Amino acid sequence: MIHFNKETFEKALAEGKLMMVDFWAEWCVPCQMLGPVIESLADRYEGRAVIGKINTDEEQALAMSFQITGIPTVIFFKDGKEIDRLEGVMPPDAFIQVLEKNL
C-alpha cells in the first residue's frame, strides 16, 4: 500500500491506472477501523490496482481539492478521473464491488 503525498499522488494519477485512495487521519477512530480493510485490499489487488492512503492532516490542500468533508472517504480513480466515492466505514465487499467493476 502506498502512502501518497501530493507529488506521488499526481504521478500515480497521471498513469491512468485504477486507483483506490483512502483519505484519512491518525486521530480518526473510524479511519483506524478501516485501515486493516484497506491494507488487505492492497495485498489482494497488487498488480491490478493502485491502492493507497492520503493523510488529510499532512495533505490538507489535496484533500480540499477533492472536497473531502468527512473521513474516512475512499475515492476511486480511473484514467486520471474520479469514478466513484465511498464515505464512512464500509464492509470490504463495497470496495471490492467498485474495484471489480472497473478492472
Label each region the model flagged.
Residues 23-37:
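Conserved redox-active cysteine motifs that mediate thiol-disulfide chemistry
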Residues 16-18, 35-54:
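Conserved helix-turn-beta segment immediately C-terminal to the redox Cys motif
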Residues 17, 24-27, 70:
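Short pre-active-site segment immediately N-terminal to redox-active cysteine/selenocysteine motifs
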Residues 60, 66-75:
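Structural micro-motif
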Residues 2-18, 60:
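A short beta-strand-turn-helix
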Residues 76-103:
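Non-catalytic, surface beta->alpha helical segment in thiol-disulfide oxidoreductase systems
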Residues 2, 50-52, 83-86:
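Structural signal for short hydrophobic segments within the conserved structured cores
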Residues 9, 21, 38, 55, ...:
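Residue-level signature of catalytic and energy-coupling elements of molecular machines
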